[in-house]
Each structure stands twice: as C-alpha cells, then as structure tokens.
Amino acid sequence: MPVGNSDRGIGLWAGQIMFGFDNSNEYIDWWHDVLPDSLENFEHKGAMASSILTPSVTIGLSNYINISLSQVIGYRHMFWDKDEYSIHHRTEGSNNNFINAVGGLLGDRKVMIRYLITNTGKGSGTRVFVGGGVSLPSKNTLTSDPFFLDNRDEIDEHRHFSVSDGCYKLVGELQFYLKRDYDPVFVGGAFQVQTPIDENKYGY
C-alpha cells in the first residue's frame, strides 16, 4: 500500500471495512529572546513534546463511495527550562485545565466521503480519489486568544497550546497514485485543504 496516513491510496469495495491507526510524535527544543514591550526581561527557553494518535475506520458504501471516520487523541507537554516565573510558559500538560484552557485528550473528529474515480486492485493502474468532509472540534481547546491581539492591556497568565483549536472546518481532498509492477510500486501523493467555517465560539 502507499506510505503515509493509513487511509491514503486505499479504496474499498462495497461492504468492506478497514481500520487504521496513525501515530505522530514530535519534540521541539525552543528558545526566544526577550520580547519587545514585554514585562519579562529574560530569555524564554523550554521544550514541547507531543504524541498524537489517530484511529480511523473506513467503510465501502459501494464500489465507488467510501466513508471514513477518524478521531484525534493527543497529549502535549510543555517543559519550562527557566527558574524565573513567566505568565506565558510553565511546565504543564494539555490534559489539565488552565485559566484559558479546557484540558483533555480528545482532539478533532473528522468525517470524510470519498469518490473513487479509479481504483486499481491487482495489476498496474491508477488510484484517483476525490473527497470532502468536515472536521468537528472537541471541547479541549483554548478559551481565549493567547496572544491578546484585541486587548494588550489584559495580558495575564495563559496557555498557548491544546489538542483542538475549537473550529469547525470544511475539508477537501485529492489523492492520485500510480500502481506499478516494479519498485517503487506506488508513485503519487495526496493533497488536502482544511478551512475554518467560522471563528470558534471563543472568538478567535
């Protein structure tokens, strides 16, 4: 099968069911200098570790139409590597609540419907799919703008990260793969775009 996300490049026939599981781990060692107009006159330094799991199920409604359901399950942890107190950063995890954050492990849910234009099984040929769907946010998000863009005078303790951004999004997708009888067997890729329908309920 094509490499990448577990539901990429695979079309199901009517009645078939496929379960998938994607995992992404990330570690960011970060630092930045003193911010302009900041009350904190020291460098900021730390690390951010993230582990994101995305189980999914795809069902062949017909030989040409598939539906996929997926759920993000994630955890992000900030390590604050300074002795000074900061209103911007501290050692904490995305599973816990904070002043401007609802903590938890569940992220966005996604529902996708794909039309299989071509779906080569045995032998060489193309797999071309077009799809569309919606991404549904969880409640585990930031409850205010962490950059205080609308009112700099109200800057207080806050968090910058969560497992969901709280926005409903429309999703469009195009997949194109060429299946061959020699290595590499699959050549191609997928293009996906997500766009928010509106601001989230917290206004950002």
Annotate each PLM feature.
Residues 7-16, 28, 64, 119-128, ...:
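Short loop/turn motifs that connect adjacent beta-strands in outer-membrane beta-barrel proteins
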Residues 108-168:
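Hydrophobic alpha-helical segments and helix pairs
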Residues 31-38, 79-86, 141-149, 198-204:
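Outer-membrane beta-barrel translocator domains and adjoining extracellular loop/strand segments
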Residues 25-52, 160:
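Surface-exposed strand-loop-strand hairpins of Gram-negative outer-membrane beta-barrel proteins
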Residues 38-43, 92-101, 156-162, 199-204:
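Extracellular loop and loop/strand-boundary signature of outer-membrane beta-barrel proteins
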